[in-house]
């Protein structure tokens, strides 16, 4: 089939590579978000998908909005059979959805109808899901509500960050998306409506959402830290400045600390929660590089009974 691929971040690149490598499909063009400022100099930088497409000699379309007439005219001119999508980053209007003969097919990183929305992997980790996965589905005007073509499952490991899990799903999902394109072309794959039961939502995790509440149980603190790593980054406040929490682990035999209370030993630093303590393994003070929690604690000389939090 003739395809127009839509995607933007690094997580979409494995799927694009899988479709480029396919001997059954032609990636005629790529749609991605416009170049965005990055780095200290705030220089405009092309998206990872745009860079990969340019390396492969594929036409790149960067509409400010996917309803722009110039973009729609070019899309109609290309006349794709199908438009596979991975983390494009903009809602597609009906006028765009109607262009490809076989629609737009999204690779979504959850087992739909669970975790519909922008941050399914982060929410799966934060909720303590033991299994998640990826789904390919036909995009409709609703939020991730279209009929499903295929799914795969992936174990959520006890130490997974959302970044770890998303990386595995990106590579596994690339094969699922390519197989979905094959099945659509063959006419052997038919989308099945999502059940009405089991719908959960996964809105974008904000910086405010990522603030650790020390009154929560240790298990919840651990999940928030892992779910918000690498982005937006779990955090707390120490002496009026933000402290990023990169890695923490529950310590089941410490129940002597009040929520937010710090306790430093020679090679460890602990903080109390609503249940057990957690050990801060890696942190990043404001304006500094990541460091081991014990090294940070030695440097700041924690006072007896000193607290983390607002």
Curated annotation (Swiss-Prot):
Reaction(s) catalysed (UniProt annotation): L-methionyl-tRNA(fMet) + (6R)-10-formyltetrahydrofolate = N-formyl-L-methionyl-tRNA(fMet) + (6S)-5,6,7,8-tetrahydrofolate + H(+)
Q: Which domain of life is it from?
A: Bacteria
EC number(s) in its UniProt entry? 2.1.2.9
| Entry's family note | Belongs to the Fmt family.
GO CC terms: cytosol
Its function, per the record, reads:
Attaches a formyl group to the free amino group of methionyl-tRNA(fMet). The formyl group appears to play a dual role in the initiator identity of N-formylmethionyl-tRNA by promoting its recognition by IF2 and preventing the misappropriation of this tRNA by the elongation apparatus.
Top-tier EC class: transferase
Protein name, please? Answer: Methionyl-tRNA formyltransferase
Gene designation per UniProt: fmt
Q: Quote the Gene3D superfamilies the UniProt record gives.
A: 3.40.50.12230
Q: Which InterPro entries match?
A: Fmt, Formyl_trans_C, Formyl_transf_N, Formyl_transf_N_sf, Formyl_transferase-like_C_sf, Met-tRNA-FMT_C, Met-tRNA-FMT_N
Supply the source organism's classification: Bacteria, Bacillati, Actinomycetota, Actinomycetes, Kitasatosporales
